[in-house]
């Protein structure tokens, strides 16, 4: 790094806006949301989504309440083109949802884009071109008048192409790409030229979208830029002013919030901040920030864990455990003073009163999460190395949510025994909890041995046979109960796990599955570990189950039995 970075980098000039009004305003309603997960988010993936994953994510975006969804860049990708046509031809877009497609200012691309959405009930077509000095001068070699002519000519072409499709309501969106780095006078001149070329009016809707293509300033500077434009755009009453913040400086959410104060009516972003480089603005965080201020966001995150699973599976990108609102650790307090404040807050919180629990800006149950692991003990009490010791000494690598669950079990035992738990003690607890599941509320009063507290179990595996079946596979499963009685159950499903669930006759939902090598044994003696996370509709939260066997299919079946046993034990304990 340079000792004097000013020799290499220049600060963005402040906006001359001495009478700025946005700092004294208060947010009172949610913006119009556009999800760009299927376009901006998709193009930033190691492996872009195929049509199946794009359709799955599209339906999830509709489910949580997005009314505008950017479905792709059809002129640049055959998969995008086919996906867009499939959505339209199969009538998969609800009447209250508007798709958006993107194109550069090129005649062939605009023609292909119109073809991709012809026949849609209503569609937004998104034009963009870069206008900042570095792009004008270095990349394109164009003057400002040439940029304006480029915009006007291609909007005129778009009007001619869409005139032959009166069955579709055409909405134009124009983005002066690199807006945040361009001269405001140039941005205004180009945007006003686009507004006039489209002839924006009561029956010709138009969106002016102002992006932080690359985030280069503090959020207040961006807010000043938005307010400056908001005051000066022509035909403002017929425009929707939109922003598209990126997160290069880590302040995309703040940029969006302050831009809304400055006049932005619409925000484009991605679930959990996916997108190019450091990502787009995280619409989940932004929406829930509004929610915690008493503003209905218009998006439903009442099962945020399910949404996170879909996003992770479709994008193949993990969500950080510290990610706001959704991370596995965001509702966990390790500090003793935090734990004390939270405990007192819960004790004082009345069901009908405003939320006032310290350190928790939102009630986790509003997001479908539980209170189970909010208060935990860390290394201050000698328990912080649980996951490390299991991995180092026993080759067990637990998923993050399983670490949270298991540490709570260990802490309960440690608190009762008032003794230090060694690595072997931890393994004993792990083995008896997951490999021989116990009933709920075990008695930890006997501090000389763990066995009295952990000896009861259910669904003991004996053997199984798998057979082909029209549904996939059929399992004949032999089980023993705690009395040693043997029984046989059967079920079918699209694989051994689904068949096992069917055989048990429980409304068990498998939320995640992982398989690992234990790193012990060679060849036929090598041990495999299967881990499932399961949920029951009648029981809050989820439970993990583990199976260990040299055959991974058998280990998977045993993992399902483990999870089911833990639920069965808890329900028996309640009875």
From Swiss-Prot:
Signal peptide region: none
This protein's record includes keyword Plastid: no
GO molecular function: 2-isopropylmalate synthase activity; acetyl-CoA C-acetyltransferase activity; magnesium ion binding
Catalytic reaction(s) noted: 3-methyl-2-oxobutanoate + acetyl-CoA + H2O = (2S)-2-isopropylmalate + CoA + H(+)
GO BP term, pick one: L-leucine biosynthetic process
EC top class, as a word: transferase
Listed Pfam families: HMGL-like (PF00682), IPMS_D2 (PF22615), LeuA_dimer (PF08502)
Residues engaged in binding Mg(2+): 40, 244, 246, 280
EC assignment: 2.3.3.13
Transmembrane feature ranges: none
Keywords: Amino-acid biosynthesis, Branched-chain amino acid biosynthesis, Cytoplasm, Leucine biosynthesis, Magnesium, Metal-binding, Transferase
CDD domains: DRE_TIM_LeuA
Location of the protein in the cell: Cytoplasm
The protein's required cofactors: Mg(2+)
Positions of disulphide bridges: none
Pathway(s) this gene product operates in, as recorded in its UniProt entry: Amino-acid biosynthesis; L-leucine biosynthesis; L-leucine from 3-methyl-2-oxobutanoate: step 1/4
Family of the protein in this entry: Belongs to the alpha-IPM synthase/homocitrate synthase family. LeuA type 2 subfamily.
Chain's role: Catalyzes the condensation of the acetyl group of acetyl-CoA with 3-methyl-2-oxobutanoate (2-ketoisovalerate) to form 3-carboxy-3-hydroxy-4-methylpentanoate (2-isopropylmalate).
HAMAP family: LeuA_type2
Assembly mode: Homodimer.
The protein's name: 2-isopropylmalate synthase
Organism from which the protein derives: Herbaspirillum seropedicae (strain SmR1)
